[in-house]
Swiss-Prot record:
Gene: cysD
Family label: Belongs to the PAPS reductase family. CysD subfamily.
Organism: Bacteroides fragilis (strain ATCC 25285 / DSM 2151 / CCUG 4856 / JCM 11019 / LMG 10263 / NCTC 9343 / Onslow / VPI 2553 / EN-2)
BP terms from Gene Ontology: hydrogen sulfide biosynthetic process; sulfate assimilation
The protein's name: Sulfate adenylyltransferase subunit 2
Pfam families: PAPS_reduct (PF01507)
Known catalytic reactions: sulfate + ATP + H(+) = adenosine 5'-phosphosulfate + diphosphate
């Protein structure tokens, strides 16, 4: 093959993801793209924009707001939704929020179920979405590693890992009965390093929390938790110290550990990723609140 016809590794991944996104737009009546404000979501949104350029993305973005996201995440979401004219839906479980549900009072498992999973399932039912894009990658965590790109959900939005559809080459089965749906993961074959290299290549805006900076953190169960607002319990406040840290993954601030790092530019992050031996999910408290935690959450309808 002539050199000019060869695609780079990133361009191959890009082409595969764009094909998946277009396939969903063609096959489903009412798809939605779940937007978590993180680096993977930012890449997925850019791919969707490319897939339909110069037209507009033909489906909305939806953010499930747990009310415990980092302040910088919400600021970034609102700023860029306005700047790029996104059709953005924001949904929350306000009943649980007003009842005082939170990670410090109820623990990570109950908080995640009520403020994330149940909020998501209600929103999917409310808008009658039949397909939902997610930014999960197979290299993140073992239960995600075995999940199909087109991941079938029954009428209760539940996933059965022992009853998955075969996926041969780039042929995807989009058939569902009324009430059933598909979760679609166009970034399945990307790695964390691929994501960062693509962000650098495309100059994609990301939340500043990904860059190393002096931040107020406290040690909680082996994790460096950033003191993001006044809801930090009193007992931890005198333990706050300033450290040079960044976040490899973003979620609810009491459940997301920072890592000590000097990587304050994209180039330094890419260099750091080339030598790291741990998944970014090792800093997410929700992945370890019970045995087989992520798989159980996904069975129940989690992202």
């Amino acid at each position: 093959m002539k050199e000019e016809y060869k695609l780079s590794h990133l361009k191959e991944l890009e082409a595969e993801s764009i094909h998946i996104i277009r396939e969903v737009a063609a096959e489903f009546e009412n798809p939605v793209m779940l937007y978590s404000i993180g680096k993977d979501s930012s890449v997925m949104v850019r791919l969707a924009e490319k897939a339909f350029y110069p037209g507009k993305v033909p489906f909305p973005l939806m953010h499930i707001d747990s009310k415990w996201k980092f302040k910088e995440m919400i600021q970034f979401r609102d700023e860029y939704a306005k700047k790029y004219g996104w059709n953005l839906i924001v949904e929350s479980n306000m009943e649980a929020f007003h009842a005082g549900v939170g990670p410090f009072t109820h623990g990570s498992k109950v908080h995640t179920d009520l403020m994330k999973t149940q909020a998501l399932l209600r929103a999917l039912d409310k808008y009658k979405f039949d397909a939902a894009f997610g930014g999960a990658r197979r290299d993140e965590e073992k239960s995600r590693a075995k999940e199909r790109i087109f991941s079938f959900r029954d009428k209760f939005h539940q996933w059965d890992p022992k009853n998955q559809r075969p996926e041969l080459w780039d042929i995807y089965n989009a058939r569902v009965h009324k009430g059933e749906s598909i979760r679609v993961f166009p970034l399945s074959n990307w790695t964390e390093l691929d994501i960062w290299q693509y962000i650098r290549l495309e100059n994609i805006p990301i939340v500043p929390l990904y860059y190393a900076k002096e931040r107020p953190v406290v040690q909680m169960d082996g994790n460096l938790i950033m003191a993001d607002d006044e809801r930090l319990p009193e007992k931890y406040r005198d333990q706050i110290e300033m450290k040079m840290v960044r976040f490899r993954t973003l979620g609810c601030w009491p459940l997301t550990g920072a890592v000590e790092s000097e990587a304050d530019t994209i180039e330094k992050i890419v260099e750091e990723m080339m030598t790291t031996t741990k998944s970014e999910r090792t800093t997410r408290v929700i992945d370890f609140d019970q045995e087989g935690s992520m798989e159980q959450k996904k069975r129940e309808g989690y992202f």
